Structure formats: structure tokens, C-alpha cells
């Protein structure tokens, strides 16, 4: 499935124009006296749809009026991504919003949060609990470590998003600030806070992050990715 990457203005328009929904699943007993609208899916004694369409049906329940409501949002503008046809490994518990681009053989681990407009290149791994803000971009064959944050930018629309290059390793709990670009082949050490652009093939560390060395054979060996983890 191909998703066209959106500009900031397109994302803002998408959110602003979207019908805000409170999606619910309702399990009920008794009989519904009112007709079920087309916007509501009824499977046996379970209803799926927007709360504002389902609530009136429950008011008119006949006989047994018990019901249970399950919900996970309120007036949400952006649905979660339909992952069924994405050629990537996405583990349970990852939260990925609509209009996210995910390349072939990428890996999204449990607890990762990926906001609207983000782009993840082929073969890239987003580790547990990592956060990719709106419009953040990661190239191919990179690794975003557990708990790392790539800050998002949707407003102001003129601001530049985070851009991570190809073959980059961002260590656990590192933070890359809005607008920063990290060049191909570079390494961001665990816990670093990156406030300025990082050139290609260097290691940065510290708060704020500074270049501590150029990539050498020893660093490449320590940061090599495992292709077996990306097999589908």
C-alpha cells in the first residue's frame, strides 16, 4: 500500500476537516426498538460506531437494559493506520496514526508511538517506546532506539521536521529536537539531546550533543544491524 507523504498544510487541513468521532464498541442485552443507522455496524448484540449515533439507540432498549461501552478516544480527528497490507513487522502495542508511510521490511516494536505524517524507510527499526512526532522522517536501514524521541512538527506549518538519514543509529532515550537533520551513517549516543544538525559518518554524544569522533571500523562493528530481525 502506497501512502503519499503529506505537507504540514495538508496535515492541518486533514485534521481540521475531519469528522471528529468518539468510536465505541457497545455490548448490550435486550432488544433495540429504533432502527440502526447505516453508520453503525451491528453484529449480534454488539454495536460499533460513533457514540453520538449509538447513544440514542441505548436509551430505547427494551426489557433488559444492561450494556457495556468500550472506548479509547473522544472527538478524535485522526484514525489509527490500517496495517493489514503493510509489508513490515509491526508488533502488538505500537500506536501508529493514519497517513504514516512505512517502508518494506521495517520493524515497529511494542509501545512505539508514530504520529501523522511520519515516514519510516525500508529496513528501519523503531524500537520499544520510541516516539516519532508529526512529519518526522527516518531513512532506510536505520535504528531508532528504545525510548528515543524524534520531535514532531505540525504547527507552525513553516517549521522543518526532524530528518534522520540512512544507516543511522539513534541510541536509547536520545532526543532529536525539531528541525534537526542527522546525516547518513551517523550514530547518536544513548541519552544525547541533539539540538543542531549532525553531518554524515560521525558519533555525537552529550547534552547538548557534540561530535566526539568520526565513524571507524570499530564503531561500525558495534552498531551493525541484524538483517534477520527484518525478515517478514
Curated annotation (Swiss-Prot):
Keywords attached to this entry: Acyltransferase, Amino-acid biosynthesis, Diaminopimelate biosynthesis, Lysine biosynthesis, Repeat, Transferase
InterPro entries, A to Z: DapH, DapH_N, Hexapep, Hexapep_transf_CS, Trans_hexapeptide_repeat, Trimer_LpxA-like_sf
Keyword hit for Repeat: yes
EC nos: 2.3.1.89
GO biological process, one term: lysine biosynthetic process via diaminopimelate
Listed Gene3D superfamilies: Hexapeptide repeat proteins (2.160.10.10), Malonyl-CoA ACP transacylase, ACP-binding (3.30.70.250)
Disulfide bridges in this chain: none
Any one GO MF annotation of this record: tetrahydrodipicolinate N-acetyltransferase activity
Annotated pathway: Amino-acid biosynthesis; L-lysine biosynthesis via DAP pathway; LL-2,6-diaminopimelate from (S)-tetrahydrodipicolinate (acetylase route): step 1/3
Chemical reaction(s) catalysed: (S)-2,3,4,5-tetrahydrodipicolinate + acetyl-CoA + H2O = L-2-acetamido-6-oxoheptanedioate + CoA
Entry's family note: Belongs to the transferase hexapeptide repeat family. DapH subfamily.
Role noted for this protein: Catalyzes the transfer of an acetyl group from acetyl-CoA to tetrahydrodipicolinate.
Protein name: 2,3,4,5-tetrahydropyridine-2,6-dicarboxylate N-acetyltransferase
Amino acid at each position: 500500500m502506497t501512502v503519499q507523504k503529506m505537507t504540514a498544510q495538508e496535515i492541518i487541513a486533514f485534521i481540521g476537516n475531519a469528522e471528529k468521532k468518539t468510536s465505541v464498541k457497545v455490548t448490550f442485552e435486550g432488544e433495540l426498538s429504533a432502527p440502526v443507522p447505516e453508520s453503525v455496524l451491528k453484529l449480534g448484540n454488539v454495536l460499533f460506531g460513533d457514540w453520538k449515533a449509538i447513544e440514542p439507540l441505548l436509551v430505547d432498549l427494551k426489557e433488559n437494559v444492561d450494556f457495556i461501552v468500550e472506548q479509547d478516544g473522544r472527538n478524535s480527528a485522526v484514525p489509527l493506520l490500517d496495517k493489514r497490507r503493510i509489508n513490515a513487522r509491526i508488533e502488538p502495542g505500537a500506536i501508529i496514526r493514519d497517513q504514516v508511510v512505512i517502508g518494506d521490511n521495517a520493524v515497529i516494536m511494542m509501545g512505539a508511538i508514530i504520529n501523522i505524517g511520519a515516514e519510516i524507510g525500508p529496513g528501519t527499526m523503531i524500537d520499544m517506546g520510541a516516539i516519532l512526532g508529526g512529519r518526522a522522517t527516518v531513512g532506510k536501514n536505520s535504528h531508532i532506539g528504545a525510548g528515543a524521541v524524534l520531535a514532531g512538527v505540525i504547527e507552525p506549518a513553516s517549521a522543518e521536521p526532524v530528518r534522520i538519514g540512512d544507516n543511522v543509529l539513534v541510541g536509547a532515550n536520545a532526543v532529536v529536537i525539531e528541525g534537526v537533520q542527522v546525516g547518513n551513517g551517523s550514530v547518536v549516543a544513548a541519552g544525547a539531546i541533539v539540538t543542531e544538525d549532525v553531518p554524515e559518518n560521525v558519533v555525537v554524544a552529550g547534552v547538548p550533543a557534540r561530535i566526539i569522533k568520526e565513524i571507524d571500523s570499530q564503531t561500525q562493528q558495534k552498531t551493525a544491524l541484524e538483517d534477520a530481525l527484518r525478515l517478514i
